[in-house]
Amino acid sequence: MSKFNRMHLIVLDSVGIGAAPDANNFVNAGVPDGASDTLGHISKTVGLNVPNMAKLGLGNIPREQPLKTVPAESNPTGYATKLEEVSLGKDTMTGHWEIMGLNITEPFDTFWNGFPEEILTQIEEFSGRKVIRESNRPYSGTAVIDDFGPRQMETGELIIYTSADPVLQIAAHEDIIPVEELYRICEFARSITLERPALLGRIIARPYVGEPGNFTRTSNRRDLAISPFAPTVLDKLNEAGIDTYSVGKISDIFNGEGINHDMGHNKSNNHGVDNLIKAMTSEDFKHGFSFTNLVDFDALYGHRRNPQGYRDCLHEFDERLPEIIAAMKEDDLLMITADHGNDPTYAGTDHTREYIPFLAYSPSFKSSGLIPVGHFADISATIADNFGVEKAMIGESFLDKLV
């Protein structure tokens, strides 16, 4: 009999809570990450009002300087701590894979200055189409088609771009480059990015339609990921016949491995919360685990170094938290965490190497307080412990602390 019949894990993408001990080994535009602090700097510079997360214990998480505008609760309703990453990376896939129990000792490659000429030339030779060199850098997916879509419509050239994560994305107007052709080109790109110096987590086909000034991306997106290099706790749950629900890009991050119910991509954080609540209130979801990623913090505000937008996005999630809690059953456990930092006040535009917050709440709790500081993979070890399956490579369960 599981202590918690259902467990729900929400990753607030990039919501770090202060520089990790090894942060100075990671850099942003030449500046070490040692002074990064996503939540701390948002709270200090633009104010942060998240009463529902504060009630669970967000302001109680141990820090050298308390969060300026998030007070500690004398009697929180949940358990709280912060967790440290052991893997050699600060990207989305590394963070999520470690949360699910893997230790990534060979990080994926990211391309802040765009992909090397060798890769672009191989794609050109395979496809018979030229690549627009000016788009070959980290780019917003909507901005890149606004900037280069008109040219693509005239020339048929490929729009290839990347992001802070280890991904290669190809945008193609469906009337100019048919979707099936785009998929073939992406499959070729996948075949040449499976090992270093270009080990990429995902190749993403990004079809779009419309006219200049009014382009829209279509639902024909396709992700060509790589599977985790070892079984994760998702795999262990799936093998044991336990329901696993994915909300947002979780299924992409794990290449579908270990997931038996995919609620689809999120159009926004609010849409993701809607999808999570839909899963939680489904008649079919009686026992098991849901895993949600809410990416707007990172994609819309962290990389763009927009602390006000990031703060507002946190406020928006906090306002929805009571709805999520209302969808819980008595023996459910809700866990809220992150996958890395992305301090919107920091140098550069990359992720930041930080501790992640961890909050846990159940209507069945008889107590509350702090859990000892641990590591990302402790989350999956706790999930495995609860459902009676093996943990993955690393992680120590804190299930016995949740009472």
From Swiss-Prot:
Keywords: Cytoplasm, Isomerase, Manganese, Metal-binding. It holds the Pfam family Metalloenzyme. Belongs to the phosphopentomutase family. InterPro entries: Alkaline_phosphatase_core_sf, DeoB, Metalloenzyme, Phosphopentomutase_DeoB_cap_sf. Signal peptide: none annotated. Its cofactor is Mn(2+). The gene is deoB. It comes from Streptococcus thermophilus. It is found in: Cytoplasm. It comes from the Bacteria. This is Phosphopentomutase. The keyword Nucleotidyltransferase does not apply. SUPFAM superfamilies: Alkaline phosphatase-like, DeoB insert domain-like. One of its GO terms (biological process) is 5-phosphoribose 1-diphosphate biosynthetic process.
